A protein has these predicted regions:
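Active-site core of glycosidic bond-cleaving carbohydrate-active enzymes
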Residues: 221-223
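Short, acidic/turn-prone active-site loops that include or flank metal/cofactor-
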Residues: 205-208
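Active-site mouth of glycoside hydrolases
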Residues: 1-199, 210, 215-219
Length: 223
C-alpha cells in the first residue's frame, strides 16, 4: 500500500556501466533541432527550446499517479550517471559536442556547481518549466538531484531556494527535498542535508537512519 514514488530523470541519451548493456533514453527536456548531429548520431540539442512532448508526458504521469492516491517526487537532476557510467558524459546534452548553443563544461562536475553562469541559467529555465507544468497538481514533491557528490552542495542549496522563491508566487507550493550526496570519493555528509533549506531530506544510514532513526527535531521531514 505504498503512496509515494520517485519519478526518475535520466540525463544522458546513451550510457553504459562497465561491461553492461548499452542503454538509451528519450525523450529529453530540450528539442533536438540541429543543425548537425550530436555524438549519438541524432540532431544536436537546442538548449533554448523545450521539447513539449517531454513535459506533456511528465504531467500525464503525475496525473496518473494522483488518480491512484500516489504522491510523486519529481527528480529534477540525476547525478549518478555522470559520475560512474563508463559511457555517458560524452552524450550529455550539455557536452559541447551535443548542442548548438556553444554550451559546455571544462569538467563534468561543473554541471552541478555554480561555476558556469550560462549552464546555471539554462538549468534554472528548465526547472521553471517543470514547475509551470505541474504546479496546479497536489501530489507533487521535488528532489533536486539524485546522487551527485559533495561538490554539488551549494548548487543544491541554490536550487532549493530557487524552486521555493518561484513557487511562492504560484498558486501552490510543494515540498522541496535534498537526498544524500553519493560519490566514490566525494560523498556528502548528513550534516549538509540538515543544514540545507530543504523541506525534506533523505540521509545516509549513519546515525541509525536505516533502521533506528533518532527523534526528529521537526525542522525537516525525514521519510
Amino acid at each position: 500500500n505504498h503512496n509515494f514514488i520517485r519519478l526518475w530523470r535520466w540525463e544522458v541519451p546513451r550510457h553504459r556501466y562497465g561491461q553492461g548493456a548499452l542503454s538509451f533514453c528519450e525523450p529529453h527536456p530540450w528539442a533536438r533541432t540541429g543543425p548537425g548531429n550530436a555524438r549519438d548520431g541524432k540532431p544536436k540539442f537546442d538548449l533554448t527550446k523545450f521539447n513539449e512532448d517531454y513535459f506533456k508526458r511528465l504531467r500525464q504521469r503525475v496525473e496518473a499517479a494522483a488518480k491512484r492516491g500516489i504522491f510523486v517526487s519529481i527528480m529534477l537532476f540525476e547525478g549518478h550517471c555522470l559520475q560512474f557510467a563508463d559511457e555517458g558524459r560524452e552524450f550529455h546534452p550539455f557536452h559541447p559536442d551535443n548542442n548548438i548553443n556553444g554550451i559546455g563544461w571544462t569538467n563534468w562536475e561543473e554541471y552541478y556547481t555554480l561555476k558556469n553562469p550560462k549552464i546555471l541559467q539554462l538549468q534554472e529555465a528548465y526547472v521553471l518549466k517543470v514547475i509551470d507544468t505541474v504546479n496546479d497538481l497536489d501530489n507533487v514533491l521535488y528532489e533536486i538531484c539524485n546522487e551527485a557528490g559533495n561538490y554539488s552542495t551549494e548548487w543544491q542549496y541554490h536550487m532549493i531556494r530557487f524552486v521555493k522563491a518561484y513557487e511562492a508566487k504560484k498558486p501552490k507550493q510543494h515540498p522541496v527535498g535534498m537526498t544524500f550526496q553519493y560519490g566514490a570519493q566525494r560523498s556528502g555528509r548528513n550534516e549538509d542535508l540538515f543544514k540545507s533549506p530543504a523541506d525534506w531530506i533523505s540521509p545516509n544510514p549513519e546515525g541509525g537512519y536505516r533502521d533506528d532513526p533518532p527523534p526528529n527535531d521537526g525542522r525537516q521531514i525525514v521519510p
